[in-house]
Regions:
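Small-residue-enriched alpha-helical segments and adjacent helix-cap loops
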Residues: 1-80
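Cysteine-centered iron-sulfur cluster-binding motifs in ferredoxin-type domains/subunits
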Residues: 7, 47-51, 71-93, 104-118
Length: 118
């Protein structure tokens, strides 16, 4: 099983792969050690959609995906984020300056839940 370490190094991870890999291997262990499979099986666990876990070249892949729109707390934003960097991190342009005042807004229709802004 190929996997990434998720939260240790990835800024956009949706999960940490270590627990998932342990659970998968606990279930499949007998298949691997007793050679019950017809051929080699490549399994990958990716923490995000950026393919750090080689999910694109595996037979079976488990990928963590963000499913909720990022929440913006405009009262804490200036103390925790570089606003221009946060805006630029969005590949679809879903994050914009708030036209009604300070802070940012997220366009729900444009957000692809990549996690770059987290």
């Amino acid at each position: 099983i190929v996997h990434t370490q998720g939260w240790i190094h990835c800024h956009s991870s949706a999960t940490d792969a270590s627990g998932l890999v342990k659970a998968i291997m606990d279930e499949l262990f007998d298949y691997f050690v007793k050679f019950k499979l017809e051929s080699k099986l490549k399994i990958a666990v990716g923490c995000c959609i950026n393919m750090g876990g080689a999910v694109h070249c595996s037979d079976l892949a488990v990928v963590g995906v963000h499913t909720k729109l990022p929440k913006v707390d405009n009262t804490k934003l200036k103390a925790t984020c570089e606003i221009p960097s946060t805006i630029k991190s969005c590949p679809t342009g879903a994050i914009r300056k708030n036209p009604e005042g300070d802070g940012l807004v997220v366009n729900k229709e444009r957000c692809m839940f990549c996690g770059n802004c987290y």
